[in-house]
Each structure stands twice: as structure tokens, then as C-alpha cells.
């Protein structure tokens, strides 16, 4: 992607900011994968995010295979960004190429007043 300010983050993934993510979604059909536990995910997540808790990620890689074959960017998020970095390392180890993490996680997203979906 052509964003000058994307930086290398933990887990060997590039980081995108909360303000860059909507652009990555609209221009490259990026998929957001939230690696929080289900209860935390239900309290708030990025619109249309897929929930695969970090503990289950290795066993659920098949769910993401269709995005790898379509060469879609995968953006990993969690509350602060720490679990997303660990998830990025798992995806990179399994040869996913377009792996990004949301810098600052959902906390940074909310700080920018971007929309959050909640499930009751």
C-alpha cells in the first residue's frame, strides 16, 4: 500500500494507525481480525471485524485461508495491540504475507472517535 507512515511493528507485521485503517479497508478490502476473547469482543470491536481469540488462532487459520489466496490484507486488532502482535507472528510463521496490526489497538481507534460495534 502507498501509506508513507506505515511502520514495522511487533510480530514482523506492519502497523497501521486508526486513521489509516478505514482507507486500507476501502482501497484494498482489508479484513480486520480481532484476537480478543469473545466476551471482550462483544463489548466493542471495529465494524465487520472477525473474532478469532488469540488462544484459538493457530487452530482457526483455515478461516483466514480465503483471504491469503485473494491476497487481501489482514489487520489484527485487540484492546491495546499486544495480542495482535503475537497473532501477527503466528500468521507470518504460517506464510501469510499481507499482515498488519492496528497501532494502539481498539483504544487508539476509540480515541479517534471511529465507530465501534457492540453486541448485547
State each model region's role.
Residues 33:
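Conserved beta/loop motifs at nucleotide-recognition and modification sites
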Residues 78:
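Short cysteine clusters
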Residues 1-30, 38-73, 82-120:
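Rhodanese-like catalytic fold shared by cysteine-dependent sulfurtransferases
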Amino acid at each position: 500500500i502507498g501509506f508513507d507512515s506505515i511502520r514495522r511493528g511487533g510480530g514482523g507485521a506492519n502497523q497501521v494507525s486508526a486513521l489509516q485503517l478505514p482507507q486500507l479497508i476501502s482501497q484494498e478490502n482489508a479484513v480486520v481480525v480481532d484476537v480478543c476473547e469473545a466476551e471482550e469482543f462483544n463489548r466493542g470491536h471495529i465494524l465487520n471485524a472477525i473474532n478469532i481469540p488469540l488462544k484459538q488462532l493457530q487452530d482457526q487459520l483455515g478461516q483466514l485461508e480465503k483471504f491469503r489466496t485473494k491476497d487481501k490484507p489482514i489487520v489484527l486488532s485487540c484492546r491495546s495491540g499486544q495480542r495482535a502482535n503475537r497473532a501477527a507472528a503466528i500468521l507470518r510463521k504460517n506464510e501469510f504475507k499481507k499482515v498488519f496490526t492496528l497501532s494502539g489497538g481498539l483504544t487508539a481507534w476509540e480515541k479517534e472517535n471511529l465507530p465501534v460495534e457492540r453486541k448485547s
